[in-house]
C-alpha cells in the first residue's frame, strides 16, 4: 500500500524500485516477505513502467542459484551479485533482462580490475561447484541444524534465543535481554572458546561448516549459556 501511494503521488517520476529480497539488516529480527508480497510489487512496477531491482549482494546464492527472486517466486529486471560469487575474490555482477542490454550499452563506465583474470577464474569455478553441489539447499540445511541446536540449548537454560531470516543467512538474538548485554556476553564467551560469532549482524553459513563443527558449536553454546 505504501509503494502504491508513492507511485500515485510521484506518477511518472519513479524509474526503479530496488530492495533486498527480504529484510536482513542489523540489530533487528530479519523479516521474510508476506505471501504474495513480491508478486504484487512486480505487478505494480510493470504497470507503472518502473524497473524492479534486487540487491542480492548478501543473500545471493544462499537461497537459490537463480537469484533470490526465483526463491520467492517473482522475476526481477536487474539483480546485483557480489561476495559469494567468487568465494571471496573481488568479483561483482549485474544480471538483467535482454530488453535492458541496449540501454546499458549506451552508458560509459570504467573499471580498474577488468583484466584481472584470477577473480574471474575463481568466479567460474565457484559457480560451477555451487551448481554441482546444489549449494543453497545444503546451506539452508546446515543453518537450520545449527539454529535448531542453539535455540534448544538456550531454552534449556531459560533463554529465549531467536533465529530469524533464512537459515543460510540467519540473525540471532536473545529476546529476553532488554539491554543486549546478555547477548553480547554470550557472543563474547563463544568467541573466547574458539567459536567466531557476531553480536548484532547476520551469520553467513558456508559449505566448509561440517556436522561435527555444528555439534561442537552447540555443545560450547550449552556450556556458555549454563555459565551466564
Give a label for each model feature.
Residues 1-228:
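Conserved N-terminal phosphate-binding loop of PLP-dependent enzymes in the Aspartate aminotransferase
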Amino acid at each position: 500500500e505504501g509503494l502504491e501511494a508513492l507511485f500515485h503521488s510521484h506518477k511518472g517520476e519513479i524509474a526503479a524500485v530496488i530492495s533486498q529480497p527480504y529484510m536482513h539488516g542489523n540489530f533487528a529480527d530479519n523479516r521474510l516477505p508476506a505471501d504474495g508480497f513480491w508478486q504484487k510489487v512486480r505487478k505494480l512496477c510493470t504497470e507503472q513502467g518502473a524497473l524492479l531491482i534486487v540487491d542480492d549482494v548478501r543473500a545471493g546464492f544462499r537461497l537459490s542459484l537463480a537469484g533470490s527472486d526465483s526463491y520467492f517466486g517473482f522475476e526481477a529486471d536487474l539483480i546485483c551479485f557480489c561476495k559469494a560469487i567468487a568465494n571471496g575474490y573481488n568479483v561483482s555482477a549485474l544480471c538483467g533482462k535482454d530488453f535492458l542490454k541496449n540501454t546499458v550499452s549506451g552508458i560509459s563506465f570504467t573499471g580498474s580490475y577488468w583484466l584481472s583474470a584470477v577473480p574471474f577464474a575463481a568466479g567460474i569455478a565457484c559457480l560451477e561447484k555451487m551448481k554441482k553441489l546444489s549449494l543453497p539447499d545444503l546451506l539452508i540445511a546446515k543453518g537450520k541444524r545449527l539454529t535448531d541446536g542453539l535455540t534448544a540449548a538456550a531454552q534449556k537454560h531459560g533463554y529465549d534465543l531467536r533465529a530469524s531470516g533464512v537459515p543460510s543467512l540467519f540473525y540471532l538474538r536473545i529476546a529476553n535481554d532488554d539491554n543486549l548485554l546478555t547477548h553480547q556476553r554470550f557472543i563474547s564467551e563463544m568467541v573466547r572458546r574458539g567459536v567466531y560469532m557476531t553480536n548484532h549482524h547476520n551469520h553467513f553459513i558456508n559449505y566448509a561448516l561440517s556436522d561435527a563443527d555444528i555439534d561442537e558449536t552447540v555443545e560450547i553454546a550449552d556450556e556458555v549459556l549454563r555459565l551466564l
